[in-house]
Design a protein with these regions (language model features):
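Intrinsically disordered, low-complexity regulatory segments
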Residues: 1-150, 162, 236, 240, ...
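Basic, low-complexity terminal or inter-domain segments flanking catalytic cores
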Residues: 2-17, 29, 38, 164, ...
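Conserved short loop/turn motifs at secondary-structure junctions
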Residues: 15, 95-96, 172-176, 258-267, ...
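Alpha-helical scaffold elements adjacent to nucleotide-binding pockets in ATP/GTP-utilizing enzyme cores
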Residues: 29-33, 79, 102-110, 130-134, ...
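C-terminal or mid-to-C-terminal helical accessory/interaction module adjacent to the motor/catalytic core
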Residues: 126-208, 258-259
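Short acidic, hydrophobic short linear motifs in intrinsically disordered regions
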Residues: 253-256, 265-278, 305-314, 470-482
């Protein structure tokens, strides 16, 4: 008998137990541990879903879904049925969450397995012990989990299927709206409007650099009070008056407060915090992070161990850690760093109130597998992410950092200055890992030895002008944080949501920042005007809470959908009436480019595939052009201009303008510098230790990239 794993033929063997998982990689890892009496195959995700061509939900009959077998899974379903028929028992071992439970439920339906049969097994980690634990506790399918997934799927289908045609009629075909994506775009649009409407306010500070008798090094101090009131100067005139008061005054230390401050480690990762930290520290987008995490969970080939999952399940909002993992971490910390780095008792981190605590936090499954031990077995992305996860988890179980802090009050007449400094008394967990922040603020360094009553010399006294700053644009990291803090979406939705709003061109990246496009602003304004509840963060969070109640068995999924649909249907009817005969225009961006066909200005438009140049004389003139980003470099093969482009996955690369006749392309950046040997364009290799080289055939010129920096100094 032929069995099928992700389209790959497998050898025939007598089946006793069949285990079905989602992915081929996971199947391969699990089969290694289960032995010859088990065959493990993959469903490759969902095999049944709502139809693509119609709503597929009977809104008048308790929202009954009309599921269909997926057409592209027909051959696989046939193989799964054959395998299931030949097996003594079938286990459904899809992922341990709502989506995984729903996949198992659909598999049971298609394969004729009773939903009351104890065939459902789950693995929080793909290791020998994790698989053994899961296989020893089979259970029936959890209909509360399944109904929570069904409610979310059906609600999202209703919103998307009903709203999208409205947007097509009123704006442009091919647009979409969604329960989570529309709120995410609104957050970005609202932030952009805050930035645009922000009016900077001028203010001034007075800063001193002071010298003590015991030190040559000046230390900084800041004016905080004048005549017993907080110092606040809004212009240069006010600042100059205070500076005049300070001129020739004596700076005397009036108080010194020494204390010890504890700094505690960050908890181990949840899905959200992993995506945020990978964005900040590794410059990974959410999709890239989750791809690498999925691979680490499902299993990688480790020398002398074979395939093994080296992190726990990566879709979680829990901070819980098993006692076994804590004990293993404690042993590793003591043996590697010393007993002083081990706290007196293991740390316990409290999960947020709405966390689903079925899983642990994200952690390494085998603590002794340090990043360096597995580096040779992992891809670059896998290694970087595993190192981040391993170090964060280990640090979370280490002793606090201790800081000796010093706060100094310095008076000059009726003015009070303050200076703050610290020294590290004990490095603690920071020996291994420190959490990054979106906006790091530098703390003061060490202060010299000082005494109360000591007179200080003034090395420098300046008034400095400042302006209040608008709120920053969202990055992927800060957007994920905002979504989580507002209760919008679940751990599994952050990455696909961000990918969707970028792919739909509602949002674009500028460096690491997320900026709304004119299309995104138009759609958001339209949604706010006619579907306020759909783009309201509080309403969306309430829907997530309702799904959680369904999962907990505290709410009926049909009632939840009914309550939503009644209000939504009224909104849609009213919007169609209010917008009858009206269309919304997407504003064009003006350019200095002249149409080569009619002489009118070209403008930047947004189409289904992104931005392009179109003639402002449309529809009389239909001239369009691609937006070309020239680099200043020339192709080493044909001499054409090198253009900056993006792959289908959004990764930047460089290609020749004569791409139809010349196939030269590279990930490496073309420079304006010319090769000193042959005069061709030079390229800089990707990476921190990159080289500058000439790509001209037969030239061979190369130099270290850091030579450029040396020559600048």
């Amino acid at each position: 008998m032929n069995r099928h794993i992700a389209g790959t033929e497998r050898k025939t063997k007598n089946l006793s137990h069949l285990v079905i998982v989602e992915s081929p990689a996971k199947a391969k890892t699990i089969e290694k541990y289960l032995g010859k009496d088990y065959s493990v195959v993959a469903s490759v995700g969902h095999i049944r879903d709502l139809p693509k061509s119609k709503l597929g939900v009977d809104v008048d009959n308790n929202f009954e879904p009309k599921y269909e077998n997926k057409k592209d899974k027909a051959a696989l379903i046939k193989e799964l049925k054959k395998d299931a028929k030949a097996a003594d028992i079938v286990y459904l071992a899809t992922d341990p969450d709502r989506e995984g439970e729903a996949i198992s439920w659909h598999l049971a339906h298609v394969l004729g397995i009773s939903p009351d049969a104890p065939v459902r097994v789950t693995f929080s980690e793909i290791t020998k012990s994790g698989i053994a634990a899961g296989m020893s506790h089979p259970r029936t399918l959890d209909m509360d989990l399944i109904n929570a997934q069904q409610a979310r799927r059906i609600l999202d289908r209703i919103v998307g299927y009903k709203l999208s045609p409205f947007l097509w009629k009123k704006v442009r075909r091919g647009l979409s709206a969604g329960r989570v994506q529309s709120v995410a775009v609104r957050l970005i649009v609202d932030r952009e409007q805050e930035i645009e409407s922000f009016e900077a306010q001028e203010y001034w500070s007075i800063d001193a650099k002071l010298l003590s008798a015991s030190s040559r090094r000046a230390f900084p101090a800041k004016l905080t009070e004048v005549k017993g009131e907080k110092f606040k100067a809004l212009n240069k005139e006010e600042t100059d008056k205070v500076l005049a008061m300070l001129e020739n005054g004596e700076f005397i230390i009036t108080n010194i407060k020494n204390s010890t401050r504890k700094k505690t480690p960050a908890p181990p990762f949840t899905t959200s915090t992993l995506q945020q930290e990978a964005s900040r520290k590794l410059s990974f987008n959410a999709r890239r992070t989750m791809k690498a995490a999925q691979e680490l969970y499902e299993g990688v080939e480790i020398p002398e161990m074979g395939a093994v999952g080296i992190i726990t399940y990566m879709r979680t909002d829990s901070l819980r850690i098993s006692d076994e993992a804590k004990a293993a971490a404690a042993q590793m910390i003591e043996s590697t760093y010393g007993k002083e780095y081990l706290p007196s008792k293991p740390r316990v981190f409290k999960s947020k109130n709405n966390a689903q605590d079925a899983h642990e936090a994200i952690r390494p499954t085998i603590i002794t597998l340090t990043p360096e031990k597995v580096k040779s077995a992992l891809s670059g992305d896998q290694y970087k992410l595993y190192k981040l996860i391993w170090e964060r988890f280990m640090a979370s179980q280490m002793e606090n950092q201790l800081l000796d802090t010093k706060a100094v009050d310095i008076t000059c007449g009726e003015c009070l200055f303050k200076a703050n400094g610290y020294t590290v008394k004990f490095d603690g967990f920071t020996k291994l890992y420190e959490e990054s922040k979106d906006n790091d603020e530098e703390e003061g360094g060490a202060l010299p030895a000082l005494e109360v009553g000591e007179k200080l010399k003034v090395k420098e006294l300046t008034g400095n002008q400042h302006f209040t700053q608008p709120p920053p644009r969202y990055t992927e990291a800060s957007l994920i944080k905002a979504l989580e803090e507002n209760g919008i979406g679940r751990p599994s939705t952050y990455a696909p949501t961000i990918a969707t709003i970028l792919d739909r061109h509602y949002v674009e990246r500028e460096a690491k920042q997320l900026k709304p496009t004119s299309l995104g602003i138009v759609i958001t304004d339209l949604m706010k005007g006619h579907f306020e509840r759909i783009v309201d963060a509080k309403f969306t969070a309430q829907m997530e809470s309702d799904f959680d109640k369904i999962e907990a068995g505290k709410a009926d999924w049909v009632d939840v959908l009914g309550k939503f649909y009644t209000g939504f249907d009224k909104m849609l009817t009213k919007a169609e009436k209010d917008m009858e005969g009206k269309r919304v225009k997407i504003p064009d961006e003006p350019t200095d480019i002249v149409c080569d066909k009619c002489g009118k200005p070209m403008v930047i438009k947004i189409g289904p595939y992104g931005k392009f140049l179109g003639c402002s004389g449309f529809p009389e003139c239909k001239n369009t052009k691609r937006i070309v980003n020239e680099t200043g470099g020339l192709c080493p093969h044909c001499g054409g201009k090198m253009l900056a482009k993006k792959s289908k996955k959004g990764k930047p690369f460089f290609g020749c303008e004569n791409y139809k006749d010349c196939n030269f392309m590279t990930w490496d950046t073309p420079l304006e510098d010319k090769c000193p040997k042959c005069g061709s364009t030079l390229f800089k290799k990707v990476g921190k230790q990159g080289q500058v080289y000439c790509a001209k055939d037969g030239c061979g010129y190369v130099r270290p990239a850091d030579e450029d920096k040396k020559n600048e100094n």
